[in-house]
Regions:
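Alpha-helical transmembrane segments within multi-pass membrane transporters and channels
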Residues: 46-107, 114, 261-266
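Transmembrane helix-bundle core of multi-pass membrane transporters
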Residues: 52, 56-57, 91-92, 100-181, ...
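Membrane-interfacial amphipathic/re-entrant helices at transmembrane-helix boundaries
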Residues: 1-6, 20, 34, 43-69, ...
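Short loop segments and helix-boundary regions at transmembrane helix junctions
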Residues: 14-23, 79-125, 178-190, 238-256
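Residue-level signature of the transmembrane alpha-helical core
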Residues: 30, 71-75, 106, 165, ...
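Hydrophobic alpha-helical segments embedded in the membrane of multi-pass proteins
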Residues: 4-9, 26-30, 221, 234-253
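Conserved small/polar residues in nucleotide/adenosyl-binding loops
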Residues: 268-274
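Helix-loop-helix "hairpin" substructures at the membrane interface of multi-pass membrane proteins
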Residues: 153-233, 259-261
Length: 278
């Protein structure tokens, strides 16, 4: 279900602008790097500053509470969305989708480079208190399903994936309610249907894009937390965008609930051969 979290960000931006945001995976990486940086008190651009000025500063403080670090990371991702709109998107309104797609490819490389300069390229451990590992009670409960003398030792499901499923469902329900029952949500749907018609009735395209990219940045942060908790925060994390492509193909590029369905099918396909521990 962690693939669904990445796919949600793709769907939101594609619905609002018709653009496949190639940088969504890098968003998740950047959010995870920033969160670890806040948690550990790391000085941004420490390596660059120390090289230029001959200093040896690496940390502002010893640690930061997880809740505060997550809040600051969320603010950072929303600010990043605003900067992207101001510097990139506002100059590309009404351009061909291929131009916008190429812009997101360039954006991915730029963000990846900035993340490297800010926080370094070493693998980092991310821990926000989310439990992980196999569910022992499920294994014990399913041992009895096998016949006596068999080599079946119970069903294995990672607790982290259970948490990811719950969070993804909550996000989908929240986004569905937001888009259906709020004025801003209806404006977002209008922009998704027809940019020119939305502009003609006074809807600010730039405001909607900032909102969508901000929400997408928040979702990327959630995905980055989940993936970083599972496999560590490393630059290969940006490749999860490619792993989310089957989810988008199965669920649809404009369907928010489809991201959950596609993620469920993809996760089942990937884990079914190893779901039983023997």
């Amino acid at each position: 279900m962690m693939y669904s979290l990445v796919a949600l960000g793709f769907v939101l931006i594609f619905k609002a602008s018709g653009v496949f945001n190639f940088a969504q995976g890098v968003f998740a990486l950047f959010a995870a790097l920033t969160l670890v940086g806040y948690q550990t008190g790391q000085v941004p651009f420490a390596h660059l500053i120390n090289e230029l000025f001959g200093t040896n500063y690496h940390h502002w403080y010893a640690s930061m509470p997880n809740f505060l670090a997550i809040i600051l990371t969320m603010i950072t991702m929303i600010a990043l969305a605003w900067i992207i709109e101001r510097l990139v998107l506002k100059h590309l309104v009404n351009q061909d989708p291929i131009i916008l797609f190429m812009a997101t490819i360039g954006l991915a490389f730029v963000l990846e480079g900035i993340g490297d300069l800010m926080w370094g390229s070493d693998v980092k451990v991310l821990d926000v208190g989310i439990p992980s590992g196999g569910s022992e009670w499920l294994e014990q409960a399913t041992i009895g399903l096998a016949s006596e003398g068999s080599d079946y030792y119970g069903m294995y499901i990672d607790v982290l994936n259970v948490w990811a499923t719950v969070i993804a469902v909550i996000l989908v329900i929240s986004l569905a309610i937001f888009s259906q029952y709020t004025k801003t949500g209806r404006a977002l749907r209008a922009v998704a249907d027809d940019h020119q018609a939305a502009l003609s009735v006074g809807i600010s395209l730039r405001s909607i894009w900032v909102l969508v990219w901000g929400i997408s940045g928040f979702i990327a942060m959630v995905a980055g937390i989940m993936w970083g908790t599972e496999s560590g925060v490393q630059f290969s994390l940006s490749l999860i965008a490619l792993k989310a492509l089957p989810v988008l193909i199965l669920g649809g590029f404009t369907s928010i609930p489809g991201a959950i369905i596609g993620g469920s099918v993809s996760y089942t396909h990937l884990t079914l051969p190893t779901i039983y521990s023997v």
